[in-house]
A protein has these predicted regions:
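GH16 jelly-roll
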Residues: 1-456
Length: 456
């Protein structure tokens, strides 16, 4: 391998005259700033000026005298006229479709931010029979189950054997719970106030205590709006609800006189097949008998995509008029369900009840004597507000054999098997107040101007 020669310096290269000439020629740059070689032999064409070929002056336009041209003009005007008419008719149609649902005047008749529990408005409903749903809770006035703090109203389920002197053995056998002794029971029916645990009959003292509060007899509306700001509970088989019932059941027993469920949910996790605490439902209950309740025609669920309803506060609301009931969340632009009423097809016809029978007897129309002119009966009466947290049920809210449900609704010992599985469901319940519903505020508006009669 030959040894590489060291590079020559600039001064050394310039010492060779032949080398310098070649280098100078190769690196020569023109003194002119133009990048185009100044060669006289190149012809550069001058810029051509734009020349218009537009005809000026008066010239004959024979196509304008063609009769077909006049027809084309008329056709264009006809098309334009129909387009304009279409816009006008669409605007008129939109106006008449929206006009019945334009928000009118409302009078705020009640607002509560729960700095304290206003006992002039809120009443505890105390019973042990599940209020017709077969839930496993005993509703109480105990401050462990309902209380107010800086976060608002809390409705929290607790275990009976941890918050009372009733033992685990008492829950199952030879113990009588009689709420008539201290006159705490708010029902007039003994079966709602007295129970004895008996293993032979399968009866059991409710293993859960919770609370249910209502504005019955204090605050109610017939048409208007309701908004409740709340955070929902966390835990398997917990059933929170914000709902309304009629002040006077003028059409008869449930569901003849109706029920408005503003919000119902389940405390189960997102993996629960029927929808856990990432879902909530709005529903109307109505029908001539309990077996013919047509709630399934007027129910809808809202799923939250991220998180669930136990992680933050949401506004659950309805707007109720003679023509419709509108369910929404957080604001009126977030519609959950719209149920319109039709005077030509009242709810009795919508349910198809005229074709149904029970005990070989056709079902009579329970709303035949209604004065409603919009076909909205039974939702033409005053309704009051209820806030509660139940646990379990035997009415199908938690479907049998779904999500490892530990009891069968129709079983005589449903509460027993539910309680036996406490080691599975209790760890899913939130800590402290998180296992309950936290209500930050309630607002109720009556339709119309303040001081105006609600008889719309």
């Amino acid at each position: 391998m030959s040894q590489a020669q060291p590079p020559q310096s600039r001064s050394h290269r310039q010492a060779n005259p032949n080398h310098a000439s070649a280098t100078s020629s190769a690196l020569h740059t023109p003194t002119s700033p133009s990048l185009i070689s100044q060669d006289d032999s190149l012809d550069i064409a001058p810029k051509r000026r734009f020349k218009s070929y537009r005809l000026r002056g008066d010239f004959e336009k024979p196509w304008l005298s063609d009769p077909a041209m006049k027809k084309t003009k008329w056709n264009n005007w006809i098309v334009r006229s129909f387009i304009l008419l279409g816009f006008i008719l669409a605007g008129v149609a939109c106006f008449f479709m929206v006009w019945p649902y334009i928000e009118g005047s409302y009078c705020l008749i009640y607002e509560d931010h729960f700095t304290t529990l206003n006992k002039d408005i809120w009443t505890h409903e105390v019973q042990i029979d599940g209020f017709g749903t077969g839930s496993f809770d005993w509703t109480t006035t105990d401050p462990k189950n309902s209380y107010v703090d800086s976060q608002g109203l809390h409705i929290v389920p607790t275990l009976t054997n941890e918050t009372t002197s009733i033992t685990s053995h008492d829950l199952f056998a030879n113990y009588t719970l009689d709420l008539t002794k201290d006159k705490s029971c708010t029902s007039k029916t003994n079966t709602s106030c007295i129970i004895t645990s008996d293993p032979k009959k399968g009866t059991m003292i409710p293993p859960i205590r919770s609370a249910r509060l209502s504005t019955k007899g204090k605050k109610s509306i017939r048409y208007g709006k309701v908004e409740v700001v709340a955070k929902l509970p966390k835990g398997d088989w917990i059933w929170p609800a914000i709902w309304m019932m009629p002040e006077d059941s003028v059409y008869g027993e449930w569901p003849r006189s109706g029920e408005i469920d503003i919000m119902e949910s389940r405390g189960n996790s997102r993996g629960y097949p029927e929808g856990g605490r990432n879902f909530y439902y709005g529903t109307l209950h109505w029908g001539p008998t309990a077996e013919k309740d047509s709630y399934w025609r007027t129910t809808h669920a809202k799923q939250i995509r991220r998180g669930d309803y136990s992680k933050s506060y949401h506004t659950f609301g309805i707007q109720w008029t003679p023509n419709y009931i509108y369910f929404y969340i957080d604001s009126r632009i977030h519609q959950i369900m719209f149920i319109g009423f039709d005077k030509d097809r009242p709810l009795y016809d919508l349910g198809g009840f005229a074709r149904m029978a029970e005990n070989q007897t056709l079902l009579a129309n329970p709303w035949a004597m209604s004065n409603s002119t919009t076909g909205n009966a039974p939702f033409d009466q005053k309704f009051y507000l209820i806030l509660n947290v139940a646990v379990g049920s035997k009415n199908g809210w938690f479907l049998d054999h779904v999500g490892d449900k530990p009891w069968i609704d129709n079983a005589k010992n449903a509460q027993w098997t539910f309680w036996d599985a406490a080691s599975k469901w209790l760890p899913t319940w939130g800590d402290g107040a998180d296992r309950g519903m936290n209500v930050k505020s309630v607002k109720m508006w009556q339709a119309g101007q303040c001081g105006q009669s609600s008889e719309l």
